[in-house]
Every structure is written in C-alpha cells, then in structure tokens.
Amino acid sequence: MPINIPDDLPAYKVLTAENIFVMNQTRATTQRIRPLKILIVNIMPLKITTETQLLRLLSNTPLQLEVELIHMSTHDSKNVPKEHLLTFYKTFKDIKENSYDGMIITGAPVEQMPFEEVDYWNELSEIFEWAKTHVFSSFFICWASQAALHYYYDIDKYLLKHKLTGVYRHHTNQRKMRRKILRGFDYQFYAPHSRYTTVLKEDISSNPNLDILAESDDAGVYLVASKDGSQFFVTGHPEYDPDTLDKEYKRDKEKPGVIAELPKNYYLDDDPSQEIQVKWRSHAYLLFSNWLNYYVYQETPYDLSDLHERKK
C-alpha cells in the first residue's frame, strides 16, 4: 500500500525517484474507495484447484475484492462437479452487461491445437472483444496469454520439440524497471512453466504497443505488458501450488504414447524421489499484488460506468 506523506517532505522526491509508491496528501484526501470487482475466467480443467490458487494470491493484499467466476458455456467441463459450476460459476451471457476493474483468464491444456479449433474459441474471442470496453486491466496466464496476444496483436504461437516443464530462472528487463508491475522484483527470480508451445521474442519486440518485462534464457519470454497497463501476459504458471508440476508429471507417465518430461529445476538434484524445491512463491505474490495495486486499484475509475467512455 502507498505511504501518505506531505507533498514538500524531502523524502517525497527521493522515494519517488527510487520508484517507491508515495501518495501525496492532496491525492490521499480526495480518494474514494470501494471494493474492486475482479472477474476470473476459469478455463482450466481442474477448476476448484485453479480458483483456489488464484484466490490465495489475490487475498494477499489489504484490498477488498469482489470476485466473480465464469466458465465457458460452449465447453463441457468434465473434471468439475456440475453442482459446483451451478453454485459458484456464471457464464459470459450472465455478466456481459457488467464492468470490472480487473479480469484474469487462466491457462488451458489446448495449446497444441490451432486457436480456431478450440471448441470455445468464438466465445473466448467475444470475451476478448468485450474486455476492451468493460475491463480496466486484464491478466492472461499461459495459454490465455498466447491466445490474447494472437487475438489482439496477431502474434502466433509455435510448437516446441518437447514439453517445457519446470521452474526456470528469469531476469527482468532492467531498462523497464520503472514499470510499476516490476516494483520490488529482484533482477532474477524463478517461475514455473508447463506448456508445449511458445511465442517468439522478435514478434513481440516488433510491436510498439508491447513491452517485454521479464524473460528466461531457457523458457523464453515470460512477462509482457501493453504500454498503457491495460493488458498483462504471463506465459508461465506463477499461481501453481508446490505439487502441481509433480502431479502433472505423474499423470503424463500414466498416459499411453506420451513422453513424460521431467520438470527441470523442480526436484532436489532433479531427482523425482527427492523433495520439491519451491522457489517461486514470493514472486507470485508480488506479481499479483503489484497488478492489483498499481494497475487496478490506483487507476480504475471509482464509477465503473465511466469505463466505457475511457475505453473508447
């Protein structure tokens, strides 16, 4: 949260120059505060697991959030009880007249398919288009980041020779450290990945509306942001639980015809009989709290009905 200090205090200029969020008294006295409306579009098969992971990260701030969950009405979810969907989830049709301060779209295990062959692609495309005028800032995870880059910027994804799985070291783009999403980041940090496809750095770098903020020598581009902070694309899975990659590895070993790739830098000494090394938790909390605080809470209009005018 910001600190509120007098406008003319010497520390104000020093801290501002260090990229510390300081709120002057003039702004503090005119702030109006309300709960933030956050929409989670959950397209992961294990919806209960994913919603729990995301809510855990979102809860790690003093901000009050009102969270709504939706699923794809054009897709039959087989790994979640129907009662759970009926009780806790809505569909896009139910909420499309609403506006939201923030939206998160999860990953999905469909990256080996062309986008247009995914059975809910038309519905998801409608959400992408709707978000332009009804969501202040959007956060796309793994496959959703690739899908959103494709929809908004015509950036393609490419099939990897082998599944990328593990916990990889990343480095921040030090020329972009003044971007608020990177506040408090170490120059190097770890994050999980689990995917069969990738996007190319040169495709993103050539777009003047996008910034690459973090990447990995082994896993490629990780964190991309639109210049205006309305869109964030995360190619990995910072929300993963400690044992998620372990469960995926054991699941893949049971699938006939599937080569189960050992998650890299995950087990002690890369030995699956050894304990899991959790290296990404602090990064995940910081990433989500920075997004919520700097790009949602501090910037969104108090009256969400104003969002339509701002987004035109």
Curated annotation (Swiss-Prot):
GO terms for cellular component: cytoplasm. CDD domains: GATase1_HTS. The record marks S194 as: Important for substrate specificity. Pathway: Amino-acid biosynthesis; L-methionine biosynthesis via de novo pathway; O-acetyl-L-homoserine from L-homoserine: step 1/1. GO terms for molecular function: homoserine O-acetyltransferase activity; homoserine O-succinyltransferase activity. It is found in: Cytoplasm. It comes from the Bacteria. Gene3D superfamilies: 3.40.50.880. Its EC number is 2.3.1.31. SUPFAM superfamilies: Class I glutamine amidotransferase-like (SSF52317). InterPro entries: Class_I_gatase-like, HST_MetA, MetA_family. GO terms for biological process: L-methionine biosynthetic process from homoserine via O-succinyl-L-homoserine and cystathionine. Keywords: Acyltransferase, Amino-acid biosynthesis, Cytoplasm, Methionine biosynthesis, Transferase. It is an enzyme of class 2 (transferase). The record marks E111 as: Important for acyl-CoA specificity. Transfers an acetyl group from acetyl-CoA to L-homoserine, forming acetyl-L-homoserine. NCBIfam families: metA. Belongs to the MetA family. This is Homoserine O-acetyltransferase. It comes from Catenibacterium mitsuokai (strain DSM 15897 / JCM 10609 / CCUG 48821 A / CIP 106738 / RCA14-39).
